[in-house]
Amino acid sequence: MPAVYGSRLTTFEDSEKESEYGYVRKVSGPVVVADGMAGAAMYELVRVGHDNLIGEIIRLEGDSATIQVYEETAGLMVNDPVLRTHKPLSVELGPGILGNIFDGIQRPLKTIAKRSGDVYIPRGVSVPALDKDALWDFQPKKIGEGDLLTGGDLYATVFENSLMQHHVALPPDAMGKITYIAPPGQYSLKDTVLELEFQGVKKQFTMLQTWPVRTPRPVATKLAADTPLLTGQRVLDALFPSVLGGTCAIPGAFGCGKTVISQALSKYSNSDAVVYVGCGERGNEMAEVLMDFPQLTMTLPDGREESVMKRTTLVANTSNMPVAAREASIYTGITIAEYFRDMGYNVSMMADSTSRWAEALREISGRLAEMPADSGYPAYLAARLASFYERAGKVKCLGGPERTGSVTIVGAVSPPGGDFSDPVTSATLSIVQVFWGLDKKLAQRKHFPSVNWLISYSKYSGALESFYEKFDPDFISIRTKAREVLQREDDLNEIVQLVGKDALAETDKITLETAKLLREDYLAQNAFTPYDKFCPFYKSVWMMRNIVHFNALANQAVEKAAGMDGQKITYSLIKHRLGDLFYRLVSQKFEDPAEGEEALVAKFKKLNEDLTAGFRALEDETR
């Protein structure tokens, strides 16, 4: 192994007994079968071959073990050594995670690029995930020697960056009486900052902890979620809301805008931290995230502008990286998310895309000669998906002080040809609570975000009712009315195609016009403009209120005039006489949230009053 990567492994190997080694018997792509592995455990981490490739045991039979290797296996030979490490695949958790970019098994890509000077990851490279020499500003809580600590207790804070305070917690499986706690100061991840004594045994702790990726981190209790995940996308916030701690799926064919929605969630959602996992997607998309995010800023409540990258961690496992590591990347991402949740933060995890993860499962399953199920996917696909999505939720964290945290999972799904009956999509939909279905036809019409409002749904609407009641008591009825208008438009479209628009009743013409307003000027949103890239919830509510108000007033005016002898009020008359109000309705989306909430709400209220006055004047004229 080149000296440049440190001699940590070499010394470890030299001290090992011969019994710690097995030998390669068979190589089939990323799957390696090794003999002489008696005593090994399932999911144990191993080092394969003379290059020390990282692998994980996925099947045991007699003294032979089947290993999935997370690196390119070209050049491995029969009888190459396989070294056992006696520990599962784990991630390092501590200060330094945020703003970093890792590969699927938590190797820091920036560090590897600097050390190797290569554009590709060298085989067998072993670099610590977090920088052990960097110094962090350690501030202990008001506790001292003799105090008792239990698993999950927060005993110090570390200044991670100007956006996030990093709380240092005791690992969930530790407890005892404090015999030493470091005074405030600068410490690295190697330095002992805490010593506990339990049943006469003393144990030292650093700010770093490791956790096996396949094991969910323990919590005190799971709670019912009741706070919305505000994404800044009108169609999602208003019609199909998710909650902090929810599970969402974004299935859609290629070119429908899954990645743009995932990135918008990362940039603008009301989460405290974001873990973005690029799992088997194009490398350019991760490069785009790396270029965009450091330049993007978010405005904090105290008016400070901070880079979005300071609250983001990227796990990049692009399509040209080894297939087996895709499976690990999802678990790496969710474990990092759970770590920040345990500090009391609301974390969002974007998995783009879970279909590529399922394809990795299918490939490994095929190499193991397991019985294929639907479309060649393994029979345990639904169980694996469920075990991943079940790690989401709002929880009461372990230890003190009492705090709640949440992990929201948003999984993009790429069904081949946009077919939602694909096994991955149907298995995902049986688990998740929110379905944002993207439509190829809408994308072809350049209607973005291309969320189909007729097939999408959210099962969290009931859980959020108390929030909406406090925010705006009218919102639920306004949303119901808007949905009815969109549904009615779909029914009328068939009639229009048969007999034309002119044959419709006046009220139906108004319904079609309102639906067009909702579709083109409310649900469609331009992610690349300063005024529309992010829509605050109050703006979404007021825009919808004014459009629904116009619909109600127009229908009322037509129905009132229908029974009178005077001039009839028709849809064309309304459009002709109230053209400027109509134009103002269309232009609501151009109001820039940067002007502030008060200024915008005043404008929307004025429009609402002008609509009422305009229709009243029209009714008086035609009497």
Swiss-Prot record:
NAD is among the record's keywords: no
CDD domains reported for this sequence: ATP-synt_V_A-type_alpha_C (cd18111), ATP-synt_V_A-type_alpha_N (cd18119), V_A-ATPase_A (cd01134)
GO biological process: ATP metabolic process; proton transmembrane transport; seed trichome elongation; seed trichome initiation
Database matches in InterPro entries: ATP-synt_VA_C (IPR055190), ATP-synth_a_Xtn (IPR031686), ATP_synth_asu-like_sf (IPR023366), ATPase_a/bsu_AS (IPR020003), ATPase_F1/V1/A1_a/bsu_N (IPR004100), ATPase_F1/V1/A1_a/bsu_N_sf (IPR036121), ATPase_F1/V1/A1_a/bsu_nucl-bd (IPR000194), ATPase_F1/V1_b/a_C (IPR024034)
The entry's keywords: ATP-binding, Hydrogen ion transport, Ion transport, Nucleotide-binding, Translocase, Transport
SUPFAM superfamilies named among the record's database cross-references: C-terminal domain of alpha and beta subunits of F1 ATP synthase (SSF47917), N-terminal domain of alpha and beta subunits of F1 ATP synthase (SSF50615), P-loop containing nucleoside triphosphate hydrolases (SSF52540)
Known EC number: 7.1.2.2
Reactions mediated catalytically: ATP + H2O + 4 H(+)(in) = ADP + phosphate + 5 H(+)(out)
A family per Pfam: ATP-synt_ab_N
Residues annotated for ATP binding in this entry: G252, A253, F254, G255, C256, G257, K258, T259
Keyword Nucleotide-binding: yes
Domain of life of the organism encoding this protein: Eukaryota
GO cellular component: plant-type vacuole; plant-type vacuole membrane; proton-transporting V-type ATPase, V1 domain
Enzyme class per UniProt: translocase
Molecular function (Gene Ontology), one example: ATP binding
Family: Belongs to the ATPase alpha/beta chains family.
Subunit structure: V-ATPase is a heteromultimeric enzyme composed of a peripheral catalytic V1 complex (main components: subunits A, B, C, D, E, and F) attached to an integral membrane V0 proton pore complex (main component: the proteolipid protein).
HAMAP family: ATP_synth_A_arch
Main function: Catalytic subunit of the peripheral V1 complex of vacuolar ATPase. V-ATPase vacuolar ATPase is responsible for acidifying a variety of intracellular compartments in eukaryotic cells.
Protein name in the entry: V-type proton ATPase catalytic subunit A
Organism this protein belongs to: Gossypium hirsutum
Gene it is expressed from: CVA69.24
